[in-house]
Structures are given as structure tokens and as C-alpha cells.
């Protein structure tokens, strides 16, 4: 049986565009196949969901605070009116531990992101030469992808 998806065109497009919007069939399988191909080409990969991302640059790359859920009546004198803020390490911190490898951040459910959040992902890629980002933007009958900047122009400018 011939290899249906070698990943060569995907790899070339990823290198030239740095940020891709991908549309994969809903039955799945293509994502893991492409990730396996990218790992074989020397990428360090990290998969996470885009839901609840907030400010992508802060959430993925910087130390930020998160308030725990409210668990009923608590003493106001201890933590003030706003409550306790816990410091959380960046979600993609394990991706940035190695500086010598190319890095691939794969975001699932990217259709929930706004135009400004998608644009900030493109800015993150331009700041770090070794970082590439793939955002799954929904389902399709066949595997398709385009640059994230072209997707923003097509989707939001009309």
C-alpha cells in the first residue's frame, strides 16, 4: 500500500508560512500522522486546545496568574476582595526548554479564537524563528491547509 500522506508538502508550507490553518476530516487520524512526520523531521511537538486560551502570548509563553474556583464562603480578611491568585507556569514551557530544535505548537479547536488572537499567534511566530504553529480551524471532507494570514484575510475581511 503506498504512503498516502508523506508530509513533504505540509513541511514545506510550514517552513515558508510559519503559521498554518488546517482543516481535517472529522473522523481524525490525519493530525497524528502529520505530527509523527514532523517529529521524524526534527520538530519538537506540543498539542493543546485553544479553548480558554485568553491572551495567547501570555498564556503560552509567560508566567501568569490564575484564580482558583470559588468554593463557597471564605474569609475576606485573608485574601482581600479579589481572592488568591496562583502563579501558573506557561502552558507551552516544555516546548521552549530546548533551543536547538524546531518547535511545532498544534492548537486544537482553533475556530473559537478571535481575529486578534489569531493575529497574535502570527506575531509569536515572527518573534521566534524556530517556532511554528498549526491551528485546526474546523472540519473538511479532505485534508486542507493554508497560511493563517490568508485564512484571516478570507474569513474576517469579508
UniProtKB/Swiss-Prot annotation:
Regions that span the bilayer: none
Q: What is its EC number?
A: 7.1.1.-
Q: A single GO CC term, please?
A: plasma membrane-derived thylakoid membrane
Spell out the disulfide connections: none
- Keyword set, alphabetical order: Membrane, NAD, NADP, Plastoquinone, Quinone, Thylakoid, Translocase, Transport
- Reactions catalysed: a plastoquinone + NADH + (n+1) H(+)(in) = a plastoquinol + NAD(+) + n H(+)(out); a plastoquinone + NADPH + (n+1) H(+)(in) = a plastoquinol + NADP(+) + n H(+)(out)
Q: Which GO terms describe its molecular function?
A: oxidoreductase activity, acting on NAD(P)H, quinone or similar compound as acceptor; quinone binding
Function of the molecule: NDH-1 shuttles electrons from an unknown electron donor, via FMN and iron-sulfur (Fe-S) centers, to quinones in the respiratory and/or the photosynthetic chain. The immediate electron acceptor for the enzyme in this species is believed to be plastoquinone. Couples the redox reaction to proton translocation, and thus conserves the redox energy in a proton gradient. Cyanobacterial NDH-1 also plays a role in inorganic carbon-concentration.
Q: How does it assemble?
A: NDH-1 can be composed of about 15 different subunits; different subcomplexes with different compositions have been identified which probably have different functions.
Which named protein is this? NAD(P)H-quinone oxidoreductase subunit N
- The species this protein belongs to is Prochlorococcus marinus (strain MIT 9301)
